[in-house]
């Protein structure tokens, strides 16, 4: 990773995802701006202040709790499309013995809902929150 690369690597820690590494690649600014607008519409918030408040979890709150709080009351179809868009920017190193050997994410690579929540949370913190 260089100074201009905002990719983030996250270690899978839950169940069948334990030992896998997930890398969230940098998203181009135009795509990120469009994503943020779609996100605000899908989660039916009045504005970015509400999003910031939802994405600032209380101390000791689990990542999945924050994600589920964020998704409560959302347009399910729009939210699914946003999640699939997020996952286009995720790569996986599925073998713990080769933690740096990343490849494109496949549908069956994420086995645990908590891992999906961690990935979505990391994506929002590193790509969405700095943009708003």
For the regions a protein language model found, what residue spans apply to each?
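Short, surface-exposed, charged amphipathic helix/loop patches that serve as local interaction elements
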Residues: 28-132
């Amino acid at each position: 990773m260089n100074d201009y690369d905002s990719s983030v690597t996250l270690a899978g820690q839950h169940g069948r995802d334990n030992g896998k590494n997930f890398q969230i690649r940098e998203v181009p600014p135009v795509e990120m701006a469009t994503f943020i607008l779609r996100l605000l519409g899908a989660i039916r918030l009045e504005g970015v202040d509400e999003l910031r408040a939802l994405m600032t979890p209380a101390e000791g709150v689990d990542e999945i709790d924050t994600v589920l709080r964020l998704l409560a009351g959302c347009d399910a179809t729009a939210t699914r499309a946003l999640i699939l868009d997020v996952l286009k920017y995720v790569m996986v190193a599925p073998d713990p013995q080769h933690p740096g050997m990343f490849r494109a994410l496949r549908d069956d690579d994420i086995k645990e809902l908590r891992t999906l929540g961690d990935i979505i949370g990391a994506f929002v913190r590193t790509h969405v929150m700095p943009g708003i």
